[in-house]
Amino acid sequence: MMIVLMLLLAYIVGSFPSGVIIGKIFFKKDIRQFGSGNTGATNSFRVLGRPAGFVVTFLDIFKGFIVVFFPLLFPVHPTGPISEFFTNGLIVGVFAILGHVYPIFLKFHGGKAVATSAGVVLGVAPILLLILAAIFFLTLYLTKYVSLSSIVAAICCVIGSLIIHDYILLVVSIIVAILLIFRHRTNIVRIFKGEEPKIKWM
């Protein structure tokens, strides 16, 4: 029962709509009605500006980071392989990612999983995250597409998991990569059509 409560709390933490709350409190704007209509960090930068965008990014990363340590904070006692699996910080992190993408507070219409996924990786493999961040920004510099850079970084996370032989991370990174590609499907179509907006600050 405690494991179920822990996973539920991770989902609720992930559901915290950082971009929407920052937009409404400080800018009197619902970012879902501007830009791409997305609730995540990229649209927050676009609609609310850089300072607010950085705050939203930090909060979304923190959501993924903090839940990784829930198994240490909750009195969970795995009694078998299944319960042990669900008390792994990475698996708990998946529930936060799902909360971010399908938040209960926003009728299950949320962000695209990038920043919160980065927070989960930060909690379990910070060096890997540094490498992925370098890949993300290099791709961003070359292409100017945030969506494409996110997808490339997610795929590289799968490859990195294979290299370091962390098979739970591999499973999680595959799930996240599939989810992230699915959430960016309209961006992918726009890239092929030449209609995807490019960043202008790099």
From Swiss-Prot:
The keyword Iron-sulfur does not apply. Belongs to the PlsY family. This is Glycerol-3-phosphate acyltransferase. Keywords: Cell membrane, Lipid biosynthesis, Lipid metabolism, Membrane, Phospholipid biosynthesis, Phospholipid metabolism, Transferase, Transmembrane, Transmembrane helix. The keyword Hydrolase does not apply. It comes from Staphylococcus carnosus (strain TM300). It comes from the Bacteria. Probably interacts with PlsX. InterPro entries: G3P_acylTferase_PlsY. GO terms for biological process: phospholipid biosynthetic process. GO terms for cellular component: plasma membrane. Signal peptide: none annotated. The chain crosses the membrane at residues 2-22, 54-74, 85-105, 118-138, 140-160, 162-182. Coiled coil: none annotated. The gene is plsY.
